[in-house]
């Protein structure tokens, strides 16, 4: 059933009741919006395309290469030419990782229509500056940032308009996109248009760990040592994983445990073998992994040794694509 595939490796569905109704609907449409901003990391270019690939035979999937959004957000210095090269890298990476049946669209295609801007204005008229300010974290910005650059207030309205204009039943995104998706659901009621189900995936922590227990720091391509990037070679992955924060007997706030739970175990396709002098451990599911790690049955060094070749294998399709492009332009 569709609902089972939606729930797999998902942090939150808003609402579960609405999602269950989609099992009885034909022609379900969905979208995910991605800002092109350079060389993507394992969460963007491995986890998401592999999750969506499991759904591509059941539903229509739009991948929105959000070039205008990236320009507003000053990604790649706001250079649209560079941003579009980044978008092409994203598209090729997603396809290499298995998402071959999606329809890839550029935001610049959408905004070329007067109907889009009519929808944008109708959306804006049903929001407030206060609500848009609360939504700024979707682009990693604050009110102070927007006070210096008013275009940042346009970003959340565009994201909501994307959802309405594409007329989708499902909006995919990380938990950092929750504000925009909830804004879309609220405005949908006011505009009497389709209210998209929100399917939120997990965010991966920085490999360096978090500085405080209450301060989540996510994996970021802007800090290469915090993330596994798709152009990382085996030696790079080995260095980053071996240096990564990985407290023993603890999975919460453990970036390597998160990669295991949200990337490797769901999408590797085979059991994961942890080599131990006392006898190997075969990991078959997330619950077993968590229990074995928390109990001390798996040590951090043993986990790291097992993860390195699997990560290398899983990013290889996207890495081949990256090697065919001049990545120095993103430096």
From Swiss-Prot:
GO terms for cellular component: cytoplasm. One of its GO terms (molecular function) is tyrosine-tRNA ligase activity. L-tyrosine binds at residues 31, 155, 159, 162, 177. One of its GO terms (biological process) is tyrosyl-tRNA aminoacylation. ATP binds at residue 221. A motif ('KMSKS' region) lies at residues 218-222. It catalyses: tRNA(Tyr) + L-tyrosine + ATP = L-tyrosyl-tRNA(Tyr) + AMP + diphosphate + H(+). It is found in: Cytoplasm. The keyword Ligase applies. Its EC number is 6.1.1.1. Keywords: Aminoacyl-tRNA synthetase, ATP-binding, Cytoplasm, Ligase, Nucleotide-binding, Protein biosynthesis. Pfam families: tRNA-synt_1b (PF00579). InterPro entries: aa-tRNA-synth_Ic, Rossmann-like_a/b/a_fold, Tyr-tRNA-ligase_4, Tyr-tRNA-ligase_arc/euk-type, Tyr-tRNA_synthase. SUPFAM superfamilies: Nucleotidylyl transferase. NCBIfam families: PRK08560.1 (NF006330). Catalyzes the attachment of tyrosine to tRNA(Tyr) in a two-step reaction: tyrosine is first activated by ATP to form Tyr-AMP and then transferred to the acceptor end of tRNA(Tyr). Homodimer. Belongs to the class-I aminoacyl-tRNA synthetase family. TyrS type 4 subfamily. This is Tyrosine--tRNA ligase. It comes from Thermoplasma volcanium (strain ATCC 51530 / DSM 4299 / JCM 9571 / NBRC 15438 / GSS1). The gene is tyrS.
């Amino acid at each position: 059933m569709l609902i089972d595939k939606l729930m797999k490796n998902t942090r939150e569905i808003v609402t579960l009741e609405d999602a269950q109704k989609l099992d009885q609907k034909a022609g379900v449409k969905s979208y995910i919006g991605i800002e092109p901003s350079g060389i993507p990391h394992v969460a963007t270019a491995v986890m998401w395309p592999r999750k969506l690939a499991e759904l591509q035979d059941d539903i229509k999937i739009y991948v929105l290469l959000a070039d205008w959004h990236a320009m507003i957000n000053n990604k790649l210095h706001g250079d649209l030419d560079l941003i579009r090269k980044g978008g092409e890298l994203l598209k090729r990476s997603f396809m290499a990782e298995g998402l071959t049946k999606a329809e890839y669209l550029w935001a610049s295609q959408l905004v070329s229509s007067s109907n889009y801007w009519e929808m944008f204005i109708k959306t804006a008229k049903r929001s407030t500056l206060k609500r848009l300010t609360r939504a700024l974290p979707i682009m990693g910005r604050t009110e102070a940032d927007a006070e210096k650059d008013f275009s940042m207030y346009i970003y959340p309205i565009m994201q909501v308009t994307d959802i309405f204009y594409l007329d989708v039943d499902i909006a995919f995104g990380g938990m950092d996109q929750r504000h925009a998706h909830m804004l879309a659901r609220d405005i949908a009621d006011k505009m009497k248009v389709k209210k998209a189900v929100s399917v939120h995936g997990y965010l991966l922590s920085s490999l360096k760990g978090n500085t405080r227990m209450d301060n989540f720091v996510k994996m970021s391509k802007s800090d290469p040592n915090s993330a596994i990037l798709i152009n990382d070679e085996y030696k790079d992955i080995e260095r980053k994983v071996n240096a990564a924060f990985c407290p023993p007997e603890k999975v919460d706030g453990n970036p390597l445990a998160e990669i295991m739970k949200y990337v490797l175990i769901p999408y590797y396709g085979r059991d994961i073998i942890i080599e131990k002098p006392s006898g190997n451990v075969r990991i078959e599911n997330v619950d077993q992994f968590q229990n074995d790690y928390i109990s001390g049955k798996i040590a951090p060094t043993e986990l790291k040794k097992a993860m390195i070749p699997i990560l290398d294998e899983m990013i290889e399709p996207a890495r081949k694509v990256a090697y065919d492009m001049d990545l120095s332009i993103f430096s």
